[in-house]
C-alpha cells in the first residue's frame, strides 16, 4: 500500500496491477492503489454510487428547468469522460475540467447551440441548487473535493500513467498526490493525446520537468504504419520531439476511399 499507480483508464490500471501481482507474487489486496484517479477519489472520500449524479438526475433536472439534458452514463473505465449533446452541460463540465468559469468557457465559443449567457448563468444556478437539494456530486466534483480534503495517502512511489489524457483538474489532483510522495514517475505520449475534446490538457504533460526517459522501441507498430504515422505527427508544432523504431515486420497499409468498404 506504499505504491500508487494511477491511470486515465481502468484497463491500464488493472493491467499494471495484474503484471505486478505476477512478477512479485502479490495478491490484489496487496495493491489497493492501482486504479484511476476518479476511483481513488471515490474510495478515499467514502462516496457511494447513489451520491453521484446519474442519467435519471439530469433527466429530472431537465424536466424541472425545461432543458433537454441529454446525457450518456460515464463509461466503465472510470475515466470521468462526460458525453452529452447538451451544450449547457458540456460548457459547465468543460469549465470545471479546465479550471475556468462557465462564462469564460462560453466565450471560447466551442458550443454549437443557440445559448445566451443569461441562460447559462441560470442553468449553473439551477444545477448547483439541484445537487445541493439532493446531496449529489458529479464525477468532476469528486476531483475537486479530493484536493480540498487532503485525503491522499502517503506513498513511497507513485506512477501516473496515460498522463497525456489528464485534464487540468486531474493534474491538480495528481500533484496533490505526488506532493506527499518520495518518488514520482509520469508516463505518457503526447502523440497519443486524443481527448482534448473531453478536456484533456496535453500541454501540462509537455511542460513537465524532471529526468526524461524515452522508450525508443515499439513492439506493436510495423514499419509501414510507423512511416505514415511519422509523416502525419511531425506536422504538429506543439509536441515533444522523439525518435522511435518500429518492430521488424514490414506490415501492410491499405487505403480506402469509401467508408462503406
Predicted regions and their residues:
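Alpha-helix C-terminal capping segments
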Residues: 1, 20, 61-65, 142, ...
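P-loop NTPase Walker
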Residues: 1-50
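Accessory N-terminal region flanking or inserted into the helicase ATPase core
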Residues: 2, 71-159, 168-173, 186, ...
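Phosphate/oxyanion-binding loops and surfaces in catalytic or ligand/nucleic-acid-binding neighborhoods
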Residues: 23, 40, 47, 95-98, ...
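SF2 helicase/translocase NTPase motor core
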Residues: 30-31, 36, 55-64, 114-128, ...
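Generic alpha-helical structural context detector
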Residues: 39-42, 144, 227-230
Amino acid at each position: 500500500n506504499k505504491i500508487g499507480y494511477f491511470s486515465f483508464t481502468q484497463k491500464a490500471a488493472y493491467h499494471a496491477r495484474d503484471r505486478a501481482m505476477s512478477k512479485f507474487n502479490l495478491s490484489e489486496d496487496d495493491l489497493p492503489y492501482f486504479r484511476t484517479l476518479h476511483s481513488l477519489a471515490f474510495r478515499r472520500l467514502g462516496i457511494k454510487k447513489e451520491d453521484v449524479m446519474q442519467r435519471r438526475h439530469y433527466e429530472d433536472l431537465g424536466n424541472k428547468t425545461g432543458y433537454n439534458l441529454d446525457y450518456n452514463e460515464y463509461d466503465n473505465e472510470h475515466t470521468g469522460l462526460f458525453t452529452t449533446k447538451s451544450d449547457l452541460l458540456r460548457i459547465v463540465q468543460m469549465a470545471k475540467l479546465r479550471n475556468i468559469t462557465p462564462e469564460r468557457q462560453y466565450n471560447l465559443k466551442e458550443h454549437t447551440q443557440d445559448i445566451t449567457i443569461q441562460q447559462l448563468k441560470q442553468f449553473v444556478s439551477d444545477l448547483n441548487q439541484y445537487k445541493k437539494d439532493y446531496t449529489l456530486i458529479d464525477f468532476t466534483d469528486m476531483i475537486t473535493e479530493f484536493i480540498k480534503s487532503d485525503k491522499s495517502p502517503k506513498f513511497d512511489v507513485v506512477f501516473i500513467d496515460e498522463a497525456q489524457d489528464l485534464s487540468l483538474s486531474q493534474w491538480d489532483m495528481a500533484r496533490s498526490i505526488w506532493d506527499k510522495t518520495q518518488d514520482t514517475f509520469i508516463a505518457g505520449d503526447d502523440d497519443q493525446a486524443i481527448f482534448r475534446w473531453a478536456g484533456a490538457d496535453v500541454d501540462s504533460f509537455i511542460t513537465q520537468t524532471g529526468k526524461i526517459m524515452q522508450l525508443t522501441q515499439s513492439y506493436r507498430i510495423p514499419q509501414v504504419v510507423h512511416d505514415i504515422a511519422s509523416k502525419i505527427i511531425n506536422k504538429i508544432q506543439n509536441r515533444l520531439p522523439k525518435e522511435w523504431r518500429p518492430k521488424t515486420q514490414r506490415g501492410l497499409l491499405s487505403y480506402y476511399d469509401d467508408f462503406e468498404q
